[in-house]
Curated annotation (Swiss-Prot):
<dbReference type="InterPro" id="IPR020408">
    <property type="entry name" value="Nerve_growth_factor-like"/>
</dbReference>
<dbReference type="InterPro" id="IPR019846">
    <property type="entry name" value="Nerve_growth_factor_CS"/>
</dbReference>
<dbReference type="GO" id="GO:0007169">
    <property type="term" value="P:cell surface receptor protein tyrosine kinase signaling pathway"/>
</dbReference>
<dbReference type="GO" id="GO:0008083">
    <property type="term" value="F:growth factor activity"/>
</dbReference>
<feature type="disulfide bond">
    <location>
        <begin position="21"/>
        <end position="101"/>
    </location>
</feature>
<feature type="propeptide">
    <location>
        <begin position="1"/>
        <end position="7"/>
    </location>
</feature>
<dbReference type="InterPro" id="IPR002072">
    <property type="entry name" value="Nerve_growth_factor-rel"/>
</dbReference>
<comment type="similarity">
    <text>Belongs to the NGF-beta family.</text>
</comment>
<keyword id="KW-1015">Disulfide bond</keyword>
<keyword id="KW-0165">Cleavage on pair of basic residues</keyword>
<dbReference type="GO" id="GO:0050804">
    <property type="term" value="P:modulation of chemical synaptic transmission"/>
</dbReference>
<dbReference type="GO" id="GO:0021675">
    <property type="term" value="P:nerve development"/>
</dbReference>
<dbReference type="GO" id="GO:0030425">
    <property type="term" value="C:dendrite"/>
</dbReference>
<dbReference type="GO" id="GO:0005615">
    <property type="term" value="C:extracellular space"/>
</dbReference>
<dbReference type="Pfam" id="PF00243">
    <property type="entry name" value="NGF"/>
</dbReference>
<feature type="disulfide bond">
    <location>
        <begin position="89"/>
        <end position="131"/>
    </location>
</feature>
<dbReference type="GO" id="GO:0048812">
    <property type="term" value="P:neuron projection morphogenesis"/>
</dbReference>
Length: 140
């Protein structure tokens, strides 16, 4: 027999395992407005100074992947994909269940400004994409 090939950690799709909702991760470096723990709309400052070094504020977000409709428009014609909250979850029995994928949030610290006061506050960012279920009919 030949040498064994080591399987990658992300090769799980070959085992028949799929995510119920597709998500994507990305760094956000241009966040200007956010909601804090108290529900206030605060301004996120673009840079922070730590030990006399200026750093750009970056946030790592996970969001529901926007699926493109079949027969997507050609380049230059615009794309109106399905927004999070409108696509049903994978593997759900649509005859008995309503389902949709939606973003859930977490709070992270950020340097912000609110009512002319600059402070570190917890702001809400997208943390994951989850499936929401409800019964299609209450009859069994």
């Amino acid at each position: 027999p030949g040498p064994r090939v080591r399987r990658k950690a992300n090769d799980f799709l070959h085992r028949g395992e799929y995510s119920v909702c597709d998500s994507e991760e990305h760094w956000v470096g241009n966040l200007t407005q956010a909601t804090d723990l108290r529900g206030n709309e605060v301004t996120v400052l673009p840079h922070v100074r730590i030990n006399n070094v200026v750093k750009k504020q970056m946030f790592y977000e996970t969001t529901c992947r926007v699926s493109k409709p079949i027969g997507a428009p050609k380049p230059g014609q615009g794309v109106s994909g399905v927004k999070a909250g409108t696509s049903s979850c994978r593997g759900i029995d649509n005859e008995h269940w309503n389902s949709y994928c939606t973003n859930v949030h977490t709070f992270v610290r950020a340097l912000t400004s609110y009512k002319n006061q600059i402070a570190w506050r917890f702001i809400r960012i997208n943390a994951a994409c989850v499936c929401v279920l409800s019964r299609n009919s209450w009859r069994h």
